[in-house]
UniProtKB/Swiss-Prot annotation:
Prevents the cell division inhibition by proteins MinC and MinD at internal division sites while permitting inhibition at polar sites. This ensures cell division at the proper site by restricting the formation of a division septum at the midpoint of the long axis of the cell. Belongs to the MinE family. It comes from Burkholderia cenocepacia (strain ATCC BAA-245 / DSM 16553 / LMG 16656 / NCTC 13227 / J2315 / CF5610). This is Cell division topological specificity factor. GO terms for biological process: cell division; regulation of division septum assembly. Coiled coil: none annotated. The keyword Lipid metabolism does not apply. It holds the Pfam family MinE. Keywords: Cell cycle, Cell division. SUPFAM superfamilies: Cell division protein MinE topological specificity domain (SSF55229).
Length: 84
């Protein structure tokens, strides 16, 4: 980190913010040991909002799911992007 960026502050990119949020959600769920919270619809809505800035998609074009198998959790995001 340079001194100039430290003094002026540096804006985080939306991708890194989204990545941090996903990591926090998954870590929280692992520690809790309980069934997944109902954050998936909100996560899906936020993803649609971010992707819509660049490509026209609807809520039906994205699927978010969380699966648990033994001690492994898989967050799966499927996005259908229309042909240009």
């Amino acid at each position: 980190m340079s001194i100039l960026s430290f003094l002026l502050g540096e804006k985080k990119k939306s991708a890194s913010v989204a990545k941090e949020r996903l990591q926090l959600i998954i870590a929280h769920e692992r520690v809790g040991g309980r069934p997944p919270a109902d954050y998936l619809p909100a996560l899906q809505k936020e993803l649609v909002a971010v992707i819509s800035k660049y490509v026209h998609i609807s809520n039906d074009d994205i699927r978010v799911s969380l699966e648990r198998q033994d001690d492994l959790e898989v967050l799966e995001v499927k996005i259908e992007i229309p042909q240009a």
